[in-house]
Structures are given as C-alpha cells and as structure tokens.
Amino acid sequence: MEAINKTIDHFDPSRTNQASKNITLIGHSMGGVLTRLLVSDSGNTIINALEQKYPQASDKINQMDPKFKSILRFKPLQGVTTAIFLAAPHQGTPYADASWARYLASFVKLPLSIVNKLGEMTLMIFGQDLPREINMTGVDNLSAKDPTIRVLAKLPISRNVTYYSIIGRENADGPLEESSDGIVPYWSSHLEGAASEKVIVSGHSVQETPEAIIELRKILRNQLVDQSSSKHTKALMAN
C-alpha cells in the first residue's frame, strides 16, 4: 500500500487526476488476497486477535502499535473504487498443507524490509524470535488452518468499493459449493456481497481462459460507461 501511495503522490500530488480517483485492482490467487487487504478496514481486528492469542503480551502489543501501525491497523487504499478477484483463496486452501506445498514454501522469502520490521515487532512483543506457529512465508499463511488467514477473512471490504469474483472449477459436474479449481475450493473463493460472480470450468489459472478475459473486459467496460454516465448527470445538474 505504501508503494502505491508513493507512486500516486509522485505523479499526482494533489490527487485531482481522474485516474487517482477510480482505481481498479485486479488480483489472482494470493494476489487476490493482497488485493482484498488493500480494500479492507482492519479496525482493531488484528490487534484484538493478537491479544487474544498472546494475552501475556497485551501491554507490549499496545506499546508497539503506533510504530507498526501500517501492519496492525490500516484503512482501504484511497481512490480504489473497484476490485476483481480471480481464484482468490480468501479463506485459505487445504492444499497449502500438502508436503509438496511446504517444500516449495521453503524457497519463498518475504522482502528483507518486511522481515526486518516483523522481526523487530516480535522482539518487542515476545522478547525473542517469532513463535514457531507464526510463519514467514505466504504459502504457509494460505493454509485454511492458519490463524492469520482466518483473521484476515473477517476484515470488512470498504463500502466504497464494488467487487467482483471470477472463480474456476475443474469439473462442471456436482454441487458448486463442493467444487474446486484444483487448488482453491469454491467456498474459499466465494465472497458474499460481490456485484457478480463468474464461475468458469477451469483449473487454478482461470485468468488465462477466454471466458475470464471476456468477463474482465465486460466489467471494465461497464465501469467506464458508469463513470461517463455519472459525469453526464453531474454536468446536467450543474446546468
């Protein structure tokens, strides 16, 4: 979020350009989870979860909160009006627990700046390194059993953001609720309140299918039409 804000501040410091007011975020798989965080309001949910999990560290958590505000308490990214999620495991995936996934996770490393910040934060809270159950790879945190993904799934999406879901299912047969794209189950990708939900017979790489591309174009085209109509209405009212 910080990087996006810095980019916008550089090219549009006054944030008066139309592109700064009608941002569309599109995220696939874990990118979809990150996209959701960018349009969510954490409130005190993350802090409360930490205090509930580690009551003995409650005072230290409150003491370090101001310094790590961007991690523990954040608001939706300013200017975003639309979010599109493709095969996003909002509630995790059981496949993250598989041995092959954990093997691949050993090669996944967070950026050094984030690792340093998290390391400093946990030292302040626990006076030692990260507790064993707190993992440092995105793959681990996508497990449906992971407490992190469970907390993040509870964060409310901004009312100012219209969001859409594009979901894959490997097989057209059987109940939709029991389907999966081979990696992410339908129940994890499904989001209540979505403006639309497009389910496509596809594997996890649903973003590569013609149906998904057509759906993306339709959403973006309709968004432009809506913005144009809104401008026209405002112009008429002004006259």
Each model region followed by its residue ranges:
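C-terminal catalytic-base region of ester-bond hydrolases, centering on the histidine
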Residues: 100-108, 113-239
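Serine-dependent carboxylesterase/thioesterase catalytic core
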Residues: 1-135, 181
